[in-house]
């Protein structure tokens, strides 16, 4: 990684160093890979400048032989009484989808690979009380939803935020912050006050491991296709529609979809076939078990659809009216290929 979260003001100096290493020193020719984790919109104007479009575009223009990735913890609580507790309200960051859209748009045409950093740790800290936002992950569906959504947007590399909680906490405490920064992480100490007592793998470790295995199986299929953009489907259930300023970008091979809850549908194409990665964009409920029922209309020229779930293919029959129904689990995604 070249840099974590560079500001717009740092770009010119950053690009000079990158060019020296990448080209003058021959790192690119030698096969080395470079990436940089950019800020997301919610970092604010001090970091990204006047607009996220300007921030991402300048990076993509200056440093084309890199991968673009960005930091975003999309799930958060807003405290109702000044402290983090059960009265807090669960929300989804409304810039999450639009940030992915901006990164994708600026990478396309420049040959830049796009990489997603998946939030895999929970933040509960006095450091965040200035915004009353507490970034969190507390179920596997919140990890898998991020991964499947990134794949639907055409991201081709995945990475995860994973921390040893006390190490990051100690760094912040050294700066006068006594809040517990990353309270729940994939690796936890048995005794945070005595590191000699060792550590253990938490549920977060298994959640990431399981999700990554699913993503790897799916990507083996997706890698044979070319991404054509996404459709953002507003669910019929009141209280959904949380895509913010993001818009549908797939006008090449769009599919008609109606769903109970919000849905992201990534479009793909390969050798005359259309593919669709349908992701349940319903904000994960407390149980993590709520499914999204969707009707897909592919047309009467199709007789069936191959449906991949966790990399395993099944065949779904298309009705005479050209439709078929599917249930998509909380935080899950399925890949669909209509067949004549």
Residue ranges and their predicted role:
Residues 1-340:
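Glycan-processing catalytic domains of CAZymes
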């Amino acid at each position: 990684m070249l840099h974590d979260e560079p500001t717009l003001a740092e770009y010119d100096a950053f690009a000079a160093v990158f060019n020296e290493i990448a080209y003058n020193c021959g790192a690119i020719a030698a096969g080395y890979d470079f990436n940089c984790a950019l800020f997301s919109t919610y970092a604010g104007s001090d970091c990204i400048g006047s607009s996220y479009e300007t921030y991402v575009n300048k990076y993509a223009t200056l440093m084309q032989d890199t991968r673009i990735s960005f930091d975003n913890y999309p799930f958060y609580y807003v405290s109702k009484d000044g402290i983090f507790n059960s009265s807090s309200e669960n929300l989804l960051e409304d810039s999450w989808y639009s940030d992915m859209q901006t990164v994708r748009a600026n990478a396309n045409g420049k040959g830049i690979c796009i990489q997603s950093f998946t939030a895999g740790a929970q933040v509960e800290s006095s450091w965040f009380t200035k915004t009353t936002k507490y970034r969190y992950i507390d179920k596997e569906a919140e990890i898998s939803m991020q991964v499947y959504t990134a794949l639907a947007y055409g991201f081709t590399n995945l990475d995860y935020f994973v921390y040893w909680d006390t190490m990051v906490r100690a760094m912040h405490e050294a700066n006068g912050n006594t809040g517990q920064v990353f309270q729940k992480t994939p690796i936890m100490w048995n005794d945070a006050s005595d590191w000699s007592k060792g550590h253990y793998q938490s549920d977060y470790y298994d959640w990431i491991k399981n999700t990554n295995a699913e993503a790897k199986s799916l990507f083996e299929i997706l890698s044979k296709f070319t991404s054509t953009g996404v459709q953002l489907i507003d669910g019929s259930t009141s209280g959904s529609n949380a895509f913010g300023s993001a818009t549908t970008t797939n006008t090449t091979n769009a599919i008609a979809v109606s769903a109970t809850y919000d849905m992201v549908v990534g479009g793909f194409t390969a050798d005359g076939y259309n593919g669709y990665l349908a992701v349940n964009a319903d904000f994960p409920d407390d149980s993590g078990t709520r499914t999204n029922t969707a009707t897909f209309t592919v047309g009467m020229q199709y007789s069936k659809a191959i449906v991949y779930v966790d990399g395993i293919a099944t065949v779904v029959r298309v009705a005479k009216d050209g439709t078929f129904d599917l249930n998509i689990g909380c935080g899950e995604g399925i890949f669909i290929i209509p067949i004549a």
